Amino acid sequence: MTAAPNDWDVVLRPHWTPLFAYAAAFLIAVAHVAGGLLLKVGSSGVVFQTADQVAMGALGLVLAGAVLLFARPRLRVGSAGLSVRNLLGDRIVGWSEVIGVSFPGGSRWARIDLADDEYIPVMAIQAVDKDRAVAAMDTVRSLLARYRPDLCAR
């Protein structure tokens, strides 16, 4: 049930978190690669091999890749419903399943409210983005009113 790129009315992404994720991933990768290259410099009593250097650099690249997962969050809204991509995985929630969208006080990100007190976190709309998060919630709520007018009548 993959929708074409033009089927989405709006695509929302966080603003600050990807920037911090890119910077942190870069620093982690550089530190581990540099540390790996410098393992054989000097004598500390431990004999490091080339495999240790390669492993140190590879570990840094793996950790940097894990940090880059924080740059993935995205919310797409369209006639098919809401497509939520957080750190791992992508889920399309049909309009028939949605009973609301909310941003509870004290939360780090928004959520899609489902039946039976269930919800899906939406990491694409984060509190750290402040005014952008407010604008994003306004956009999502206006699209909710368009596709689920029965919810707004309550």
Curated annotation (Swiss-Prot):
InterPro entries from the UniProt entry: CFP-6_PH
Membrane topology of the entry: Multi-pass membrane protein
Annotated Gene Ontology cellular component terms: plasma membrane
Transmembrane segments: 19-39, 51-71
Subcellular compartments: Cell membrane
GO terms (BP aspect): riboflavin biosynthetic process
The UniProt record lists the keyword Cytoplasm: no
Keyword match Transmembrane: yes
Domain of life: Bacteria
Record keywords, A-Z: Cell membrane, Membrane, Transmembrane, Transmembrane helix
Name of the molecule in the record: Uncharacterized protein Rv1417
Protein species of origin: Mycobacterium tuberculosis (strain ATCC 25618 / H37Rv)
